[in-house]
């Protein structure tokens, strides 16, 4: 499937997607696709740590050691409703299965 996707996706689109950051720090929030690897400093997280693993499905993980009170906001592991668990918030509520999309605005 991945190979077929690369065949049909125009090269400029693929280049754009590959050029995007895998982690964004925005104030007290850290935004990633799949969370962050527990007990690994943010500065040492790999691309794979941030976009592929299912560690976000495991509750009570120890946060990255240099999180400094920030909150990791991620998806990748479908949940029925957004779930806040200590140092992380999972906002993947299966938007690809026509239900609803979680949207967060700036803090008031």
What residues fall within each predicted segment?
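Short, charged, surface-exposed secondary-structure boundary motifs
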Residues: 98-107
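Acidic, His/Gly-enriched loop-helix segments that form or flank divalent-metal centers
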Residues: 1-99
């Amino acid at each position: 499937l991945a190979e077929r996707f690369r065949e049909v996706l125009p090269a400029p689109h693929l280049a754009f997607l590959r050029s995007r950051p895998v982690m964004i720090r925005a104030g007290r929030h850290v935004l990633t696709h799949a969370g962050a690897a527990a007990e690994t400093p943010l500065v040492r997280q790999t691309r794979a740590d941030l976009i592929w693993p299912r560690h976000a499905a495991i509750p009570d993980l120890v946060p990255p050691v240099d999180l400094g009170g920030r909150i990791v906001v991620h998806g990748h592991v479908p949940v029925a409703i957004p779930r806040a668990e200590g140092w992380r918030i999972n906002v993947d509520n299966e938007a690809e299965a026509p239900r609803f999309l979680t949207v967060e605005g700036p803090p008031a």
